[in-house]
A protein has these predicted regions:
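Post-cleavage N-terminal segment of exported redox proteins
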Residues: 1-50, 164-169, 190-218, 225-234
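Charged, low-complexity, helix/coiled-coil-prone segments
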Residues: 1-13, 63-73, 95-107
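A generic secondary-structure signal for well-formed alpha-helical elements
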Residues: 32-39, 64-68, 73, 77, ...
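The canonical Cys-X-X-Cys-His
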Residues: 57, 63-72, 122, 189, ...
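Surface-exposed patches in mature extracellular/periplasmic domains of secreted proteins
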Residues: 69, 135-140, 200-209
């Protein structure tokens, strides 16, 4: 028995209705199972939400549009993991509202920047990036050192995040004022940057035999790139 498709193919309204029905069933098949899961992505073991001061810094990061030039997503590519560390996983950003993965890198990825530079370096860099990176085209943010943190607004933000699943306790929220007393937006932004990558999975060291064999085949990054300018006599 042949199927007669003409009554659908020659009637755009009828065809549109059937397309909508088919797409709806496909969407329900994807969405309904998720509604019965308490949490699709589980947090990493021992993972805790960022502190009040770090959250204030994250708010500054969003307000100043830093995500427009910096991503927070290390892709599972060898070139990226060699530079930044372990590739990003969903559990790291399970409490991020909104997520800041980004889509453009005018500047480097920041997903693993925590601990790579000192607080003083970040302070100078945020005030005037060219003081530490002469070729940088990043704008400075000197006003961050003048603006104090609004503890009441931050506490309200933490309560809102708790309704979305971030496990802030009453003690965390009550301690917001003490945690941010006398702190500037510069302090908060630095604290946030230092928190990035805190729970990143660690890269496993290659077995000794494999590492030796690999070193015979491929020069190590250290053998190709001087560790400092002194090594090249500049």
């Amino acid at each position: 028995m042949s199927l007669n498709h003409e009554k659908f193919e020659k009637n755009i309204l009828r065809m549109g209705i059937w397309i909508a029905i088919v797409v709806s069933f496909g969407g329900l098949a994807q969405i309904v199972p998720l509604m019965f899961q308490a949490q699709v992505v589980e947090p990493l073991p021992d993972m805790k939400p960022i502190t009040a001061l770090e959250l204030a810094g994250r708010e500054v990061y969003v307000r100043e549009g830093c995500y427009n030039c910096h991503s927070q997503m290390v892709r599972a590519l060898r070139s990226e993991t060699a530079r930044y560390g372990h590739h990003s996983i969903a559990a790291e950003s399970v409490w991020d509202h909104p997520f800041l993965w980004g889509s453009k890198r005018t500047g480097p990825d920041l997903a693993r920047v925590g601990g790579r530079y000192s607080d003083d370096w970040h302070r100078v860099h945020l005030n005037n990036p060219r003081d530490v990176v002469p070729e940088s085209n990043m704008p400075g943010f000197p006003w961050l050192s003048e603006n104090l943190i609004d503890a009441d607004d931050l506490a309200a933000k933490m309560r809102a995040l708790r309704t979305l699943g971030t496990p802030y306790t009453d003690e965390d929220i009550a301690g917001t004022s003490a945690a941010t007393q006398g702190k500037t937006e510069m302090d908060a932004t630095i604290a946030y940057l230092q928190s990035l990558g805190r729970y990143a999975p660690k890269r496993q060291a290659a077995p000794a035999a494999d590492a030796t064999a690999a070193s015979d085949r491929v020069p190590s990054p250290e053998s190709r790139v001087p560790a400092s300018t002194e090594e090249v006599g500049t």
